[in-house]
A protein has these predicted regions:
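Conserved SAM-binding loop of SAM-dependent methyltransferases across substrates and taxa
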Residues: 108-120
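Conserved SAM-binding strand-loop segment of SAM-dependent methyltransferases
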Residues: 142-153
Length: 154
């Protein structure tokens, strides 16, 4: 949900903070730039030039989701989750902290949602350039906010 991560999002044009309008159908920057929240729950944060790439198409996303649902990468995602848990323990992160975990190229949110399941209170930002991926990303976990953006541009 974007409401859970709005405090860490910024306008890609000028870096000012974003806030949601009353019904959270738009995110608006302090400087007045507005970004529509898609009905599926993600927001596209692109600068004046828009996005250079469209990312994976629906068939690619569907194939990836089918593959991942069979558990082929389960050992890997478990190792990533354990590593992040251990890292937070090593740095002494308080139990009541709400760390933000960001995954760039998050796709459908498979990895991010598993990590959030293992870190109580953590919030997730999933970023992908594909709107098809963002539709699944937006609903992969209640503490994930989905953003369509090109991380190589501001």
């Amino acid at each position: 949900m974007l409401k859970h991560i709005i405090d860490v999002l910024a306008d890609p044009i000028d870096g000012t903070a974003l806030i949601g309008n009353d019904d959270f159908t738009q995110l608006i920057s302090e400087s007045g730039h507005a970004y529509d929240v898609a009905p599926a729950g993600y927001v596209t944060l692109a600068g004046d030039n828009g996005l250079r790439y469209s990312g994976d198409d629906l068939s690619m996303i569907t194939a990836r989701e089918t593959f991942l649902s069979h558990g082929h990468f389960a050992p890997f995602v478990e190792a990533v989750s354990t590593t992040i848990e251990d890292l937070f323990d090593d740095i002494g992160l308080p139990d009541d902290a709400q760390p933000v975990i960001t995954e760039v190229g998050a796709g459908t949110g498979y990895y991010l949602s598993h990590v959030l399941d293992s870190v109580a209170g953590a919030r997730g930002i999933g970023i992908d350039v594909s709107t098809h991926a963002a539709e699944l990303l937006a609903v992969c976990h209640p503490r994930v906010g989905a953003v369509v953006a090109d991380v190589w541009s501001r």
